[in-house]
A protein has these predicted regions:
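S-adenosylmethionine/decaboxylated-SAM
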Residues: 1-122
């Protein structure tokens, strides 16, 4: 998949602006200097670390940067209080974390498995 992405980036003339990093996410995020800003991040990884990814990215997010998070509705399981497996609880906690975060604006879309688009408040 990365080869296909690289081809499209090159065709669009943005290949010099995108850094593709394939490594454990938290480890990689911790290596990015605090001063280096991230314009866009897409979170779709182990659900138990969603809050950790979010906070690590937020600290490096540019003024108009966006964080897009996948699986926030988890096939509707997050609203069913009788479902309490580890991933469902983690996503529920993440959604509550973002809801309570006064630093951001968030729109949750019911596309697919649910996607949140999060922007740092101006």
């Amino acid at each position: 998949w990365t080869d296909i992405a690289k081809q499209h980036w090159k065709q669009a003339g943005v290949d010099g602006k995108i850094d593709l990093i394939l490594a454990p996410a938290l480890e990689t995020l911790e290596k990015i200097p605090e001063g280096q800003k991230i314009d866009f991040a897409f979170i779709d990884a182990d659900k138990g670390n969603y809050i950790n990814y979010y906070e690590s990215i937020f600290n490096r997010l540019s003024e108009n940067g966006l964080i897009v998070v996948d699986n926030v509705l988890w096939s509707g399981r997050v609203v069913d209080d009788s479902i309490n497996d580890e991933d469902t609880v983690a996503i529920r906690n993440f959604n509550q974390h973002v809801k309570n975060d006064e630093r951001v604006l968030c729109a949750m879309l019911s596309i697919g498995d649910g996607v949140s688009v999060i922007q740092k408040k101006p």
